[in-house]
Amino acid sequence: MPSRLLHTLASLHSISAKAHQCQRLTWLTLRPLRKSESTTCHNGLTIQQHLHSFFPSITADSLNKPEILEMSRITSDTSRLFPLNAVHWLDGKEHWPSMHPFGTHRSMTHKPNLLCSKWFIKAVKRHHSSVSNEALVPKQDLPQIKRPLKASRTRQPSRTNLPDLSVNEDLMQCTAFATADEYHLGSLSQELVSCGYVEVTSLPRDAANILVMGVESSAKEGDPGTIFLFREGAAVFWNVKEKTMKHVMQVLERHETQPYEVALVHWENEELNYIKTEGQSKLHRGEIKLNSELDLDDAILEKFAFSNALCLSVKLAIWEATLDKFIESIQSIPEALKAGKKVKLSHKEVMQKMGELFALRHRINLSSDFLITPDFYWDRANLEELYDKTCQFLSITRRVKVMNEKLQHCMELTDLMRNHLNEKRALRLEWMIVILITIEVMFELGRVFF
């Protein structure tokens, strides 16, 4: 690096012009100079040099020790002629100067060449930047950072806000799962009874599509363990041991229609704590308070109201995850349309996507109780209040609204793709007709002329 700077300095036009009066040009490595220091020539010329305007600071590791060059001009005898002992460096090659004799010695007034100085500063800066970027800091291929995965539901499970059960021994747990699209309650009831569970048959007749089972040993004393199994494919466990829950889930696998993924089932669940207290049953700050003075049948009905809302929540969570997965599958279509690229989807695939959307929309809006209150609560105001409060806490209405908006957007996108494919098909048919007409005209012309 210092040798290149010296050769660059030697090639300057101003130094070459001033060197015609010198006998030799010596380059020495001396101690670092101060910011402003003067060098005196033997011919009486004093040049004030501002070092940091000509030599920018170099921060490379290989240039830790600054090397300052000092130019000593010694005036030669006017009667003797000497060639210029300097080497010019141009385009990376050495160029020796021509042997032209010097003229007679004349006193000259030296003026700083500002244009050459500016060029020298630019050259040094350009050379310094090239060294620091290429030689000292080699380029490295940085790995691409992947985006974090998006959350798969509109509302996170309520279990994240639950207090620890060990703090209050009276707290019991209610857990809801959605494992399939539908259960076969008849065969399921028979197998559970054969396994030692007790079926509760005291529910009203209008409480259809529900199977209530009692367990012998509950997780905590004070409330009997109860299991609510809905035909829609959801199970709600009240004060049931974890070992018992796993056994029931294994039994459910043999009576399911279109089961869901196990990981999705265990993630998209709902957990609420409940406690037996005096007074009216209610949902207060995410905690269910059951009236301890009620008899077993009334307590089962109140648990059914809470379980019904939890069943809707976990089913909606599964459908939210399904919709998010569908959105990820068509996420590349808007980007491809924006970039002007060709969308690689056939007409059959587009119609299949539309069928998935219509099926999901039908489940949410037509075959479930998300939009209206079930008929079971019309003449049971106290149970309807518990059901509505739980749905409000679980944000059922808002989540359904968000899902319908997403479905509408996906429907518009699939309609756009279907229209685009129809236009392409129509254009292809038009071109086929044009080609056929052209062939027919050519045959007619051949018949006429030949």
From Swiss-Prot:
Q: Does the keyword Transit peptide apply?
A: yes
Name any one Pfam family assigned in the record.
Answer: DUF155
Cystines in this chain:
none
Q: Which UniProt keywords apply?
A: Mitochondrion, Protein biosynthesis, Transit peptide
| Transit peptide (first-last residue) | 1-5
Any GO CC annotation of this UniProt entry: mitochondrion
Compartments annotated for it: namely: Mitochondrion
| BP GO annotations | positive regulation of mitochondrial translation; translation
Q: Which family does it belong to?
A: Belongs to the RMD1/sif2 family.
Role according to the record:
Required for mitochondrial translation, possibly by coordinating the assembly or maintenance of the mitochondrial ribosome.
User: What is its quaternary makeup?
Assistant: Homooligomer.
This chain belongs to the protein called Required for meiotic nuclear division protein 1 homolog
From what organism does this protein derive? Mus musculus (Mouse)
